[in-house]
Every structure is written in C-alpha cells, then in structure tokens.
Amino acid sequence: MWAFSTARIGSPLAATSVTLRRCLRLGVAMAKSKFEYVRDFEVDDTCLPHCWVVVRLDGRNFHRFAEKHNFAKPNDSRALHLMTKCAQTVMQELEDIVIAYGQSDEYSFVFRKRSNWFKRRASKFMTLVASQFASSYVFYWRDYFEDQPLLYPPGFDGRVVLYPSNQTLKDYLSWRQADCHINNLYNTVFWALIQQSGLTPVQAQQRLKGTLTADKNEILFSEFHINYNNEPHMYRKGTVLVWQKVNEVRTQEIRLPAEMEGEKMAVTRTRTKLVALNCDLIGDAFWKEHPEILEGED
C-alpha cells in the first residue's frame, strides 16, 4: 500500500518537473532569432591576463576649449583642480583602480593586474572611464569656474594600453611625468616672453627654437627673475592619486556601562581615502613609500 501510494503522489511531481524543463528549453529557443548571427561580427577585445590595464584620457581640442573659457596661461589652477576632482570621482565610482596620474588636459588610470572587471573588456574600461570623467567635468564645472559659464560640452578621447610588468608600468608613469616637466618648462618661458616681453606667439616660438632645458632656465632667471624650481609642484610634476589608510578620530556617543552613560569618547577608526600628491614618480622613492600599489599583483 505504501509503495502504491508513493508512486501516485510522485507521479504528478515528476510530470510537472518534465513539463517545466520543456518550457524552459522552449523559452531559450524562442529567445533566439534569425538575426542573432550579427553577434558574430563583434570583436573580442578582452585584455591579456596578468597585465596592468592603463586607460589614458586626453582633452579633445582643449587648446580651443581653454581659449574659449579664458583659462589663465601658462597654467590655470582651477582647471587642474577640476581635472583632479573628475579623476577622484572616476576612482571612487569604478573598480580596481590603484593609482592615477594627471597633468595638463590628460589623466591616466591604472587598473590592477588581476582585475576581472567586466571580464577585462578594453571597450568597457575605456568607455566607462571616459564617460564618467566627462560627465563629472560638466557636473563640477561651477565649483571651480564660478564666474565662467560652460559654453559647450567638453570631450575626451581615451585609449587602453597594457603593461606586462611592474617596471614597464613605472616607466610609463615616469614618461608621462617627464612629458609634464618638458611641456610646462616650455610653456612657462613661452608665455613669459609674450606676457612680459611683448613678443608675439610666432616671435616667442622663434626665440625658443633649438633651446635646451638649461637655456630655458637661463631665460627665465636672467630676464624674468623666475627660478623654475620654485614654481608650484602641481605645475612641474603633475598630480598623483593614490589610496591611503588614514586614522580618523571622531568624538561620538557610544554604549558604556551605566555609571558612564551619556559620556562621549574619542574613537579612532582606520579607513581608506584618496590622497592627491604632487611628487616625483621618477625613481624608486615613491614606490618605496607606497609598496601597496604593486604588492600582490605578480
């Protein structure tokens, strides 16, 4: 009797299970269409494993943008701080970015070697960084340019480059900082010749043609009494963004024994926050001070 009863109860359950499986298979089949072959034309842009993924953004036609929006020459601190604010937003909103470096109208974002964010698709890295950065630039514009309306939306192009070792990554960042120094020294002399000596842009270019670093430093010092080494670090070295653990002390009410109820105590908590630095990336000193950036990635 028990065997017969069990068979009759189990039978409807088994039938229901079979029917459900058939419906699921039918649903999958119906979800496909004759047009689905177009997916075969999509390019596999998966980044190679065990490589640092670097996304570099550059402002599109920013010479014109800076001119139209009355940027100060040779450097506008408002524009540089706005760029850094946008970069901070990118690092806070997106995943696996361990360090960023920016100067002028460009920023580079370094994703962890082991990142599997969006299955390491280069198009996702590039488009998400570019869109987050560009939208942040518009969103925070008024915080830095209170008296200058945004006349038209800015644009940023992006590229993805893979670096297979810690040394190649360090060399990349050193290259970008060396570029910052070369460009800023030239621009500092160029605009001094225009603004203080009254030269035209063409005349200033001719004056600087063929000059070396020592020559430019000499022009600045002898003609304009400017010691380039005393120029702000942000202009000369660019900005580095890193995550740092900091101790935060706050006074707050906490649960205490009855005899101490109502009292406040200072509570220290460790948290990770973004820190902006204007320091040397060239050489080993920075990497010795921040070993956590490269640790555990090989």
Curated annotation (Swiss-Prot):
One of its GO terms (molecular function) is identical protein binding. It is found in: Cytoplasm; Mitochondrion. Its EC number is 2.7.7.79. The keyword Nucleotidyltransferase applies. GO terms for biological process: mitochondrial fusion; protein homotetramerization; response to oxidative stress; stress-induced mitochondrial fusion; tRNA modification; tRNA processing. Binds 2 magnesium ions per subunit. Mg(2+) 2 binds at residues 58, 105. It holds the Pfam family Thg1. GTP binds at residues 58-63, 104-105. InterPro entries: Thg1_C_dom, tRNAHis_GuaTrfase_cat, tRNAHis_GuaTrfase_Thg1, tRNAHis_GuaTrfase_Thg1_sf. It is an enzyme of class 2 (transferase). Keywords: Cytoplasm, GTP-binding, Magnesium, Metal-binding, Mitochondrion, Nucleotide-binding, Nucleotidyltransferase, Transferase, tRNA processing. Its cofactor is Mg(2+). The keyword Methyltransferase does not apply. It catalyses: a 5'-end ribonucleotide-tRNA(His) + GTP + ATP + H2O = a 5'-end phospho-guanosine-ribonucleotide-tRNA(His) + AMP + 2 diphosphate + H(+). One of its GO terms (cellular component) is mitochondrion. Transmembrane segments: none annotated. Its main location: cytoplasm. Mg(2+) 1 binds at residues 58-59, 105. Homotetramer. Interacts with MFN1 and MFN2; functions as a guanyl-nucleotide exchange factor/GEF for MFN2 and also probably MFN1. Belongs to the tRNA(His) guanylyltransferase family. Adds a GMP to the 5'-end of tRNA(His) after transcription and RNase P cleavage. This step is essential for proper recognition of the tRNA and for the fidelity of protein synthesis. Also functions as a guanyl-nucleotide exchange factor/GEF for the MFN1 and MFN2 mitofusins thereby regulating mitochondrial fusion. By regulating both mitochondrial dynamics and bioenergetic function, it contributes to cell survival following oxidative stress. This is Probable tRNA(His) guanylyltransferase.
